[in-house]
């Protein structure tokens, strides 16, 4: 019996005998673009999105029963893989405890205490329902704490879809920004400054003119939403030093990197303590979650302790809290991080050799811990989005569809990173490379 196969007729009868093409056409009639997050539409790579029915370990199964080895992993939350047996048991227990309280409960307390005890800059923690919500709330705290209005962000870092941060660098004066989406008013982005990554001089210039007005500098210390743009530690140290010189709070967005690159995230690896930090993905064990954390005096500004209002009906829901707690405990107990790092290097080294043997361009893998990004080889590291090679999107799309056809699922965009999980053991990796070797013969 296929352990991925759903057993409920209420679920399976809906799509029984249907194809992904058929369901996608139906979906487009009732949902924008047929999906509920744009990248899922395959717009970046072309073709029809695969409709998946179930998942287990490192494997996805589509509605036709075809299996794929998954290197997207829901864009990062599933560090243990799909339905890890221990986490699955916790979730099953939770269905018999409560689905939602909307009240005080012990499960969020235990998870918050674990995070706070292991992450020294997270003196207090507030759980929310998404990374976007976490960032929105953290910046509200920063504005309240400083009495300032402006936020400084960096081109190539993604912080969710809130209006004030869905912006890109504009032309003209340093820091000027322009909307990255329709429907965002000019007033929403008037207080957002945007600079290129890897440019300390630009940061210093903006602070010289705007420093007294900037409430927070926000950055992904490991930018992983527009490729994997690994930053120099010297750059990060310098911008943090500059921000603090002007009384600006430092916010690290670790929604992707938190508990992925190590238990203390990039902040721990770098030895740089932010004033506020946002987490998500892994801390929910695969369920919707986000949190913002930081110094006690800053978090005590949040209601009901202080004047900064933030609330949520399903915040700290028991599924996310218990699954997240179990995930973090297992990650600690089994010391998964160094093993995942080694597996990722083995996987990407061999995959790069296969790509270079079969392709008309030279590829390389950019890796950090268990994150990876395949792109055209360049002479210098790529730390800014304007340096991503031309034609990358098209080159990746060809690789994506070659792998997809043969049962390897990558994130459906050349600008999304890939992930390994604890379920990607030596056998799964070897199987992936064997499939890739055969698939690339027709590349």
From Swiss-Prot:
It catalyses: (S)-4-amino-5-oxopentanoate = 5-aminolevulinate. Its EC number is 5.4.3.8. It comes from the Bacteria. Its main location: cytoplasm. It is an enzyme of class 5 (isomerase). One of its GO terms (biological process) is protoporphyrinogen IX biosynthetic process. Pathway: Porphyrin-containing compound metabolism; protoporphyrin-IX biosynthesis; 5-aminolevulinate from L-glutamyl-tRNA(Glu): step 2/2. One of its GO terms (molecular function) is transaminase activity. Its cofactor is pyridoxal 5'-phosphate. The modification N6-(pyridoxal phosphate)lysine is found at residue 281. The keyword Cell wall biogenesis/degradation does not apply. GO terms for cellular component: cytoplasm. CDD domains: OAT_like. Homodimer. This is Glutamate-1-semialdehyde 2,1-aminomutase.
